[in-house]
Structure formats: C-alpha cells, structure tokens
Design a protein with these regions (language model features):
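Cell-envelope and extracellular/periplasmic
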Residues: 1-464
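C-terminal membrane-anchoring or membrane-association module
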Residues: 488-496
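Poly-acidic low-complexity segments
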Residues: 299-301, 472-478, 492
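C-terminal GPI-anchoring signal of eukaryotic secretory precursors
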Residues: 461-479
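Cysteine-centered motifs
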Residues: 479-481, 488
C-alpha cells in the first residue's frame, strides 16, 4: 500500500488513520502510530560505514545515550544481493531492525557480529543534525563491508563508464528474471549491480533529503582508474532514480555527502599507493567539492583520523564522531543553506614560484575555509615535481619541501631544490598515511577542518566559491507505507 498526504509542519509524534478501497467493494483501514515529519537520510558504503556504534570510540556510552533522541528514527538493513531490482525489502528477514526509536537494542548492542545493525557514522550524523536543527531525522543504514563501488551502481552507471558495457553481470542484472536465475549461480556480493538491486533500489520510491557515503577502500585495488567516472555517475544516477521513483518529490539534485577515505596501514606493513589516488578520484580529480562536475556534493576529509591501535585494524579507525561532525559541518551549507559557515578545509587557489630563490608561496583563499593554521610537521608533506618538461611526467622525481613560514592569513612559503630542473607540479599528503591523528600541517583557523590532499600543476589558479551548491524550492510531505517499511517525513520550503 502506498500513498501520500498533504504537507505538514515538521514535528510529531502523530497518529495517522488510513482507509483504503480495493475497487471491489471492500474497505480496509490501518492506523499508523508514533509518526514523525522530518528529513530522511540514506547511509551507504563499505565497512567503515557499516562499522557499528558499539565499535566506535566510547561505543558503550554512545549506545546508552542514544535513548535521549526519540525524534531520530533508525532503520537497519541486512546485507543482501540480487540480480534483479527489488521494489521493497523481501521480508522482515531483510532487516536487522525495522523503523525504531534509537536505543541500545535498535542500534545493535546484542549483535553477534561486528559491522552489523546500525552504522556509527550514520547514527552520529543523524544525531548531530538533530542537535543542530531540532528537526526529526529518519536514518537508513544499508551497507556491506569490502565492497567496491560497482555492486552499488545500476546498469546505467556502467553504460556511462564502461565502453561497450556488455559485462555478464550487467547484462544479467538488466535482463534476467528470477525464474532464470533458479538454474544459474547465485550472485556474489562483489558482482556488478547486485547491491544496487537488493539494498538501494527498494528505497527509491521513498522521498529522501539526501545520502551520505563512506566507500572507496576496496577500489584501491579494483577499478581504481575508473573510480572517478563511476562515483560521479553513481551520484547522478541515484538522483535521477530517486526523483523518478518518488514521483518527483525528491530533489533531483539531492545533497550527497561522502567521506574521503582515511588510512589503511601501520608503518611496519608498508604503503598502499592507490589510497591518495582514490581520494583524488572521489573529488572528480578536482580536490574539493562541490565542484562543477559534482554539484550539491559535500565531503568530510578523514586522512588525519588515523587509528593504528584500532582493534578492528588500522583500516577501520574508531573516530566516527569526528567523521560525522565534519559531514554535518559541510551539510549545514550544502544541504541546509546556512550562510557564513566554514565547511571546507583550506585548498590552494594559486602558487607563486620564485625559481631563483627556490621558494613557493601557496595561496589559500577559498570562501568555504577561511584563514589557515599550521599544526603538524612541516616537512615530508608537500612535494614538488622536478622536470625537464612543462608537465610532470611519470618518471620525473618528486622531492620533499619544507614549509618555512605562515606568510599571511591565507598563505604559506616553502623551500625546494630542483637543481638544474624546473618545478612544474606540487602535491600534498600524497601517501596512504601522511600524518598522525589530527596532526597534518594545514587546517582552517580553528583546527577543525584539515586541508584535503591535492596534486596540481604549479601554474594552477582557481576561484573557489559556492557556485556548485544548488538549492531547490520544493515543499512537500511524502509518506510511504510498505508491508515491511514505513517512513513519513516532511521537507519544508527551501530546506535543500
């Protein structure tokens, strides 16, 4: 059963009586109790999003405190695969827990396995949004560890990013029926599109405020080169599918937040070189969001939240509260249109090179970050490419530089030595584990937001503003009543 009601002010709880006529002279009714009107956010990704509240720092205390947020509601989805799209979750067996008020039970205190029940990042994000706006929040946690981006992408994404997209998995996802599947192999959780079908598609007819995403580690060794295309195309595709599936009630440019991946190693294990590459690809090879190719997208930089002592492995840092806080800071501008909020880490806008003195001045002046502050070690974090060419070549040498001074509110100076070569490019934090906990070199003035990594030519110049933050003017309430799902949330005018 599916229906909609007229817009209502955010709030609750309410009781809603629904009466239905089946067209054959039969009437039935259902009463929905304890209903809230507010914002729905979908949270997805791999194990760092799946990491449960109990696994986060101070998890036991966080679980106990969750009962203080009855106006945040949570839905926990089990891991499931399918070659064909689901239009609803198959049964209550598809859920760790149906829609519920947060408490230790609904957030997974009794979970037998880690990375199940409710996402820590999702919970802290929804909780902090509620603390900020006092608007009810509905949070959906649908994740699977060790997954690349491809299983979360529909066939249309592959059509955008894979030349002559005729992969067997994609063809099967698009064309095969469940009857045909009875005689074939069962889908594997890393097969193309199978998680889109089973764990995302069931929600596209539910109106949402936005989505947050924490994924990318698995693509450091699988499909690294195509990640930029896949991520951008997946965001666009999800937006199109939700806009159509919710009868044009969801913003066609709904806010999409992501976590730029953290670290994966401790020193004795070496470096996974593709971590900085994936971080770069997550921004569409621009370095910051929102940007022209990723409008209404925001991010939390996490490479300075390393946790080598994590009992879950260094690839799974426990500092999920910090991740969520940074996401919320960016969402305040991109999703909720606040003005005057510092929501981006410092990003270069221009480089001034003095080849005689061998100094480089890095200018930071992006409107979203404000003045800068130097915090951590000032050597071995900025590198310069020395070359005989005007562009850095694959075999050219990268040399470490040393930051020597903060030369103004928005600029720093560093020394370099290229001998008889020219300095043509510069990169920052271009390694798996570039700094210890909250101890990278450059932050915004209050030390809350780190500068993201970059790889840029030294003739780079850009003006960074909020031009890629786009807002809609929708005003609606949408209320879906499924056999196994219920969510009813209100989106007032201008909340995009």
């Amino acid at each position: 059963m599916e229906g909609s009601v007229t817009p209502q002010p955010a709030g609750g709880p309410f009781t809603i009586d629904i009466t239905c006529f089946d067209g054959q002279g039969n009437w039935s009714s259902i009463q929905l109790q304890d209903i809230l009107f507010g914002d729905v956010w979908l949270c997805s990704g791999q194990s760092n999003m799946a990491m449960a509240v109990s696994q986060a720092l101070n998890g036991t205390a966080e679980l106990a405190a969750s009962v203080n947020y009855p106006n945040v509601r949570v839905l926990s989805v089990k891991a499931e695969v399918s070659y064909t799209p689901y239009y609803d979750l198959n049964s209550t067996a598809s859920l760790y827990h149906p829609w519920a008020k947060p408490d230790p039970d609904s957030l997974g205190v009794n979970a037998v396995e880690n990375y199940t029940y409710f996402s820590a990042v999702c919970w802290f994000y929804g909780r902090d949004l509620y603390d900020t706006y006092k608007v009810p929040m509905g949070m959906i946690s649908t994740n699977w560890g060790s997954t690349p981006i491809q299983p979360w992408s529909s066939p249309d994404v592959f059509n955008s990013c894979v030349e002559n997209a005729t992969k067997a998995d994609v063809t099967k996802s698009r064309c095969a029926s469940e009857t045909e599947k009875e005689f074939e192999y069962k889908p594997y959780f890393k097969n193309d599109t199978v998680l889109w079908n089973a764990m995302i598609h069931p929600f596209v007819n539910m109106t949402i405020k936005g989505a947050i995403w924490y994924q990318g580690e698995s693509n450091t060794f699988l499909g690294t080169d195509t990640y930029s295309c896949f991520f951008q195309a997946m965001i666009s595709d999800w937006r199109q599918k939700w806009y159509a599936g919710s009868s044009q009630q969801t913003n066609p440019l709904f806010p999409f937040g992501f976590v730029q991946i953290s670290t994966s190693w401790v020193p004795q294990f070496g470096v996974i070189n593709n971590y900085p590459v994936i971080r770069w690809h997550q921004t569409n090879d621009v370095g910051y969001v929102p940007n022209a190719g990723m409008p209404n997208v925001f991010m939390a930089v996490a490479l300075d939240l390393s946790d080598p002592e994590s009992p879950y492995g260094a690839i799974h840092p426990r500092y999920k509260q910090d991740v969520a806080a940074r996401l919320v800071q960016a969402a305040r501008v991109v999703a909720y249109q606040e003005k005057g909020v510092i929501y981006q880490g410092p990003f270069p806008t221009k480089f001034n090179v003095d080849s005689q003195e061998e100094t480089i001045d890095v200018q930071y002046n992006n409107k979203g970050s404000g003045p800068i502050r130097l915090v951590g070690p000032l050597n071995n974090t900025f590198e310069v490419c020395c070359s005989n060419y005007t562009e850095c070549q694959e075999n050219d040498t990268w040399i470490d530089t040393t930051v020597t001074a903060l030369t103004g509110l928005y600029s720093i100076r560093m020394n370099y030595t290229c001998e008889d070569l020219d300095a043509v490019a510069i990169r920052y934090l271009w390694s798996d584990y570039p700094c210890t906990f909250k101890n990278c070199p450059v932050y915004n003035q209050d030390g809350f937001l780190p500068a993201p990594p970059f790889w840029l030519p030294l003739d780079y110049s850009v003006s960074i503003g909020n031009s890629a933050v786009k807002f809609g003017g929708f005003k609606f309430l949408i209320c879906f009543c499924h056999v196994f799902l219920f969510a009813c949330f209100y989106f007032p005018l201008g909340r995009y």
